[in-house]
């Protein structure tokens, strides 16, 4: 094993996560219908600041992400600073790494604190699947540019005459990978077939996720990290995630038909994450600064790693590539972990990654390692449920996972937690968290 990489400042101070918060997550076109991601981001950052009673002027930087970006607000981070009463001198920039976006935001802040250029910062992400950038066809887009350049009526007429009715139809955001034309669901189907992940196993994992998430809410474990969201038209506030099946029945999952391969497929709406709206954020600072301000850290960032793999085959296998790196950089093994939280984009993808964690063949042929990182103890795995139940606002999921894991580690008296996720484009992330 290589030497661990210590994530500390030059003075040896660790990077502390002082607080984390999120909105409830809402299924597309439900409680947050019509509320753009930037407004959800403002909500969560405003509430985070209010709960920590931290002077906004002390915050040096805000790094925020959004995957489904709106053209009118391309830098969501800066709009949040300007729209929440924070100091206008607070630096802000936006990041995007698909489903790993808020992990990237946290990693960037961590590195800035380590470098000494930032003392206190907020990282997070927000996405709305209910407010989408509906575009126009390429032919119409070109015609609109040409119309702006046209010098006379005849030129304008000639441009418009070339358009057909189909060119005027609105174009929704693409659901397929730009490089391959394949959707995430199609990749999940491929992984299910390639790694022999049965429909029964997928449905069982989804049922487990919903059951554990419902129990977490019933036990009050999430109340301190999710706030009641009041959004226009202010008729009915959302207090908790509305995708969770409160009384999940395993038998009911078998009734749904496959979505992406209707003949031989196993991926259904029930064993895949739904389109979701929501926002999440975490407050980070060097541990010495937290002590100066009288703030008790939730925990610390021990290590992180990102990975990139081929997009044509097993595109969602990122956790299996990033996790060995993160564990190595933390100087630990899989057995040292108290908790493991893997993003459940699809049950098939999750189960395939768990299989590869334990595969000596995968370790040898794909990772160039002499042994597998190990079989996951399911008593440590996604103990409060996962994205299949909570939903997945793309840019917010990482911050949700970090906050949730740190709180659960504290309830268990401390330890080490792993967060890991796949992301579009063959990307992956793993992050090790520590609670004393």
UniProtKB/Swiss-Prot annotation:
Location relative to the cell: Cytoplasm
Pathway membership: Lipid metabolism; fatty acid beta-oxidation
EC number: 2.3.1.16
GO cellular component labels: cytosol
Active site, renumbered: 99 (acyl-thioester intermediate), 392 (proton acceptor), 422 (proton acceptor)
One MF term in the entry's GO annotations: acetyl-CoA C-acyltransferase activity
Record-linked Gene3D superfamilies: 3.40.47.10
Sorted UniProt keywords: Acyltransferase, Cytoplasm, Fatty acid metabolism, Lipid degradation, Lipid metabolism, Transferase
Matching PROSITE patterns: THIOLASE_1 (PS00098), THIOLASE_2 (PS00737)
Stored InterPro entries: Ac-CoA_C-AcTrfase_FadI (IPR012806), Thiolase (IPR002155), Thiolase-like (IPR016039), Thiolase_acyl_enz_int_AS (IPR020615), Thiolase_C (IPR020617), Thiolase_CS (IPR020613), Thiolase_N (IPR020616)
Reactions performed catalytically: an acyl-CoA + acetyl-CoA = a 3-oxoacyl-CoA + CoA
Lipid metabolism is among the record's keywords: yes
GO BP annotations listed: fatty acid beta-oxidation
Chief location: cytoplasm
PANTHER family xrefs: ACETYL-COA ACETYLTRANSFERASE, CYTOSOLIC, ACETYL-COA C-ACYLTRANSFERASE
Function (record text): Catalyzes the final step of fatty acid oxidation in which acetyl-CoA is released and the CoA ester of a fatty acid two carbons shorter is formed.
Family designation: Belongs to the thiolase-like superfamily. Thiolase family.
Subunit structure: Heterotetramer of two alpha chains (FadJ) and two beta chains (FadI).
UniProt name for this protein: 3-ketoacyl-CoA thiolase
Classification of source organism: Bacteria, Pseudomonadati, Pseudomonadota, Gammaproteobacteria, Aeromonadales
GN (gene name): fadI
